[in-house]
Structure formats: C-alpha cells, structure tokens
C-alpha cells in the first residue's frame, strides 16, 4: 500500500519497492489513525519504516512466522518451500460442505488444530506423506468427533514411532466416523492401542483398509487397536503384518481388542507374538461383543507358553456368527488354547454357523488344541464345522472331510440364499458379499464361463420381470447392455 487511511491485517508483500520518499516494504505511509496488525514483508524488498514486520526469506516460508493467521480455512503454506498462499475451495466443515484436504500440508494443518476435530472433512486426492516420521498419532491433539471421508483415496508412506494410542488417529471418540479411506505402505510401532487407522475407537469406521506394518505390546490391530463398546467397524479389511514381542497381549489382524461390532470385514496378513503372548487372533485378539459375516486368512503364530490363539479370534466372550478362517495357527512349546477358529470360547461366548480349515499346531507340551475351538468353558457352539485334517476333534464343532466341506448339505441350518455361497464340489463356502459382480456361475471368479452366461442374455430388455435377467443386468437398468459389460470387465479374473 502506498498510503493507508484504514486498517491492514494478516497481509504480506514480497515484491521490490523503489522510490525516493515515503517508501516501505509493506506500506509507504499511513494516517495517524490507520492500524496495521499481523502483516509482514520480505526484508530485502524495501525499507523497514516501522509499518509491518520484516521477515527473511527463510522466515517467510515458515508458518510460525505469521502470528494470528488462519492456516486452516484461509491460508496454506508448504513449509520451507513457498510463501503463504490462499486455499482454494476449502469448504466450511459442514456435512454438505466439508473441509477439503488435497495435500500433505492440508492434512498436517488439520491435524495440528484440535478445535476443528468436531468438523467434517473429505479427501480430494491421494496423499503421500513422503516417508515423514512421527512420534505421536498424526491426528492426535484430542479425541476426534467429526467425520473424515477418504472419498476412495489413500494416505501412504508414513512412519510412527510412539507410545500409546498411535496411528493415523489417536482416538476416534463417540460420534466420530471415518469412512472410504485406505492406508498403504506405513509402519506404526508403539506400546498400547497401536494400529494403522485408530489406536482407540468409540465411533464408527466403514469401508476402510490398511496395508502396512504394525507392532506393539498390547491392543495391537492392523486397523484398530481397541474398539470400544458401541463402535461399529464394517466393510473393512487389513493385509497388514501385526507383531508383538514377548509378553504381548491382544493382537489381531484387524482389531486388537473388540468390545464393539465388526461386520463384513476380513484380514489376510500375519499376526505374530513372542514368548508368553496372549490373545492372538487372525481377525480379532479378544472379542467381547459381536463379530459377524467376517473371515480371516491370516496366519497366527505365538512363541513359548503362548495362550489363546485362534485363526479368527484369540478369545471369544461375545457372539460370532457366519464367519470362517483358513490361516494356520501355531503355538510354541508349552502353549495352550489353540483353535482353528477360536482359541478360547468363554462361558458367555457363542459360535454359530462358522467353519475353519487352517492347520492348528502346538509345540511340545502344549494343551487344549482343537480344529475349531481350542478350549471352551461353558461356551456355546452350534452348526459350526472344521476340516477333519486341520486339528484334533475335542467335541467343539463338527469335523468334515474335504469332500463334505464342498457340499452345501453338510452345513445344517445355514442360509445359502442371503448369507453364504458355495460352488459345490469345487470350493468351500464363501460369504455372499465376497462374490464380485459378473461372477454368475461356478467356479468362483469372473472368467469365460461367466462371459458365456452373460452373452446369452445380451440385449434382453425384460430384466425387471425376470430376476434382473438372472443377475446379468448388473446396473439394474432393465436391459443387459454395454454398461453391464463395462462392470463385468472391471472384475475380470477377480473373485477367485
């Protein structure tokens, strides 16, 4: 400004100023009543006449130099690289107009201000954290009670070496929700409540996944460390490696300790505990409430004197229904309570309509080993089965041969219309939500057999009255056409 009669706040200038009189880096001159606050100029751009604060080039690239500025809704900065610039279309934090996060700088700015943790956010791009190392959860200043919508995007390449409650979020509290978010190529290590997404959650988590490495001593999960009562985790998965050292407890491929609900979820990573480790599960270390419509392919391994190891759950004190596990369960010498599905089914625990096929192996001196459940003290098991060669038949569950496991008639009282699917004589049962669009016929997976089925119904127009043309009308438009073919192509050679 050449001469100011009014007020100037939260402004800066960096261009060169040349003149003979009334020259300043920010303002040339001003009226006695004019105010200037929180405004700055580049020290080499022009004379410092006392109007505004001069900053070096390095200081101009540091957020901390600009006292009182709003770097959440108005300004943005790439630390060490650029001067402040205006955010573009950042939103207002409401459900209809969430704050938009497009860059690493946006995410770190949001994480730094806990006063906004009750607002709504949406990712508008994938974010690469560029290998940055943190010592706390990234979003950790307070409990998160807002909504964080990943919008189908992912956050990648970060490392956290901290204590308790570490992960992307430290704590998701009641009312908070995270959805549609992927976490990839990360490493998180800590003590208790350690995970990829949330150390502690009492909110809701849906349609999220993690593919990284997580390690800690207690309540360690590929996605969530501790899932509080009332929290629902749905349509999520983890392929992460979960590791605990000696004396580790509550390790799960998806959740370390579950006192909420997990549904339509799966895990395919590994869960490994050291000597004297307790509560190790392919999906959940300890379940006290509900797990349904889930599966695990995770291998579970414990060291010497490890206790409560299960292909799906280490310990179950709640309800498990319509679940299965296929991973190997291995305990070291003197281990106990090892089960293909559940290590220990407590008196309050129920297991219904489940099966397991993974081998259950205990070292020398191990006790309480079962193909389905390792040990059950007054727990209930119904309509649940295990592969006869996988582990001992201790009376918990019904053993089936490989041939019987591939026959629908073997699974008494199971719902093969809306819950389960089986390609008889070919595969063991799968949950119906696992069947991908375009997989019309057996065997499982979208291939030329399905294409032939689809071609026979090409351009049929009576789908609304014909069971959606036997399912070939994938977009439910009433006609089997190019739009349905495009959907089928998206899943080609998937679902096996």
What are these regions (language model features)?
Residues 433-496:
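Cellulosome-associated attachment modules in secreted, modular CAZymes
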Residues 1-436:
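Surface-exposed repetitive/solenoidal architectures
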